[in-house]
Amino acid sequence: MFKINDNYLKLPGSYLFSTIGKKVAAYQQANPDKEIIRLGIGDVTQPLAPAVIDALHKSVDEMGHAETFHGYAPDLGYEFLRSAIADHDYKKRGCDISADEIFVSDGAKSDSGNIGDIFSVDNKIAVCDPVYPVYVDTNAMAGRTGDYIPEKQAWSNVVYMPCTAETNFAPELPKETPDIIYLCFPNNPTGSTITKDELQKWVDYANKVGAVIIYDAAYEAYISEPDVPHTIYECEGARTCAIELRSFSKNAGFTGVRLGFTVIPKDLKCGDVTLHSLWARRHGTKFNGAPYIVQRAGEAVYSEAGQKQTGEQIAYYMNNAKTILEGLKSAGYTVSGGVNAPYIWLKTPDKMTSWEFFDYLLEKANVVGTPGSGFGPSGEGYFRLTAFGSYENTVKALERIKAL
């Protein structure tokens, strides 16, 4: 008789955003006349930049001719894209990252879930609390998190690093030493950031205790303040302790195109074994490469026109963030984020739970957001709104919320 991976049975309910989708669909079916504004899931709404569309058209045309047709992509990504990433995202910032330390994939979500394949199940993970739920859920699937404790909304074998208003929604070094540390800055969901000096403390700590940092920098393009690092490799010693995850979804609107990359320096080792070699083996075995046309589109993001056009889109979303932030403040809400990230983190009013406020906004204002408790136990009593809607819908949503 075959057996299943019973770690999946430990997972509570469905994935956060799947649960939200089901609740919204049920409400819409019962109230077909209501116009629902979605400021929940972090999906973009603006079209792809013209430079990206031009690259897609050109590469699709190439696929129509035998002499320029491309089949399977190289395991680790085409050289033209990896070089563009290394030059623009790292060398221009003074970071020693080479093209052959970059692994192209179909997105940061896939990589954040798959990176655990190269680590022993015995490793203990530490996560910011609250944080993107994929980190914990995928480690639970692998059997790394112990048992789920419903009354605590937490796992028994996870080191939670509370990110609360008292700490400016940034984590403090954990008292219990973990093996794998997940950091996400600018943070999803709180929108918080840390300075380069603060990040350096984490790098020094990881090197001291022999931990590895998995650094999710999916939102680095939204950074506006000069003392906030765009990559962990701006910190001295990061090459020996850090893996960085990046995405084209938020900086270039590739949510429907799918492209990302992971950086693993060759200096990052466990004993004599490089994590670079392990991930290369895993990547080559389980992934057949991002499509040629998508990688050409990614290359176009780094062109002069691509940078200008995607920069304008980022400014559009950050104007939405400013609108939400200022609108909620004027309505008396306690809010943060929205400065270096497209997320606004607000305290629920009248001591409502996160899900109570979700239902309240949906039913009374027909606005969808994300319950903070879905990101971890310290997210209870908070709520996330995204700036990825249209400006018109953002303004309309704020008018409805302020009228409550």
UniProtKB/Swiss-Prot annotation:
Pathway: Amino-acid biosynthesis; L-lysine biosynthesis via DAP pathway; LL-2,6-diaminopimelate from (S)-tetrahydrodipicolinate (aminotransferase route): step 1/1
Cofactor: pyridoxal 5'-phosphate
InterPro entries named in the record: Aminotransferase_I/II_large, DapL/ALD1, PyrdxlP-dep_Trfase, PyrdxlP-dep_Trfase_major, PyrdxlP-dep_Trfase_small
Gene3D superfamilies cross-referenced by the UniProt entry: Aspartate Aminotransferase, domain 1 (3.90.1150.10), Type I PLP-dependent aspartate aminotransferase-like (Major domain) (3.40.640.10)
Binding, substrate: Y15, G42, K109, Y132, N188, N288, R384
Domain of life of the organism encoding this protein: Bacteria
GO biological process: lysine biosynthetic process via diaminopimelate, diaminopimelate-aminotransferase pathway
Keywords, alphabetical: Aminotransferase, Pyridoxal phosphate, Transferase
Catalytic reaction list: (2S,6S)-2,6-diaminopimelate + 2-oxoglutarate = (S)-2,3,4,5-tetrahydrodipicolinate + L-glutamate + H2O + H(+)
Binding site for pyridoxal 5'-phosphate: Y72, A108, K109, Y132, N188, Y219, S247, F248, S249, R258, N288
Enzyme class at the top of the EC tree: transferase
Pfam families cross-referenced by the UniProt entry: Aminotran_1_2 (PF00155)
PTM sites of type N6-(pyridoxal phosphate)lysine: K250
Enzyme Commission number, as recorded: 2.6.1.83
Disulfides per UniProt: none
Keyword match Transferase: yes
Example GO molecular function: L,L-diaminopimelate aminotransferase activity
Family statement: Belongs to the class-I pyridoxal-phosphate-dependent aminotransferase family. LL-diaminopimelate aminotransferase subfamily.
Function (record text): Involved in the synthesis of meso-diaminopimelate (m-DAP or DL-DAP), required for both lysine and peptidoglycan biosynthesis. Catalyzes the direct conversion of tetrahydrodipicolinate to LL-diaminopimelate.
NCBIfam families, A to Z: DAPAT_plant
Subunit relationships: Homodimer.
Name this polypeptide is given: LL-diaminopimelate aminotransferase
The organism of origin for this protein: Lachnospira eligens (strain ATCC 27750 / DSM 3376 / VPI C15-48 / C15-B4) (Eubacterium eligens)
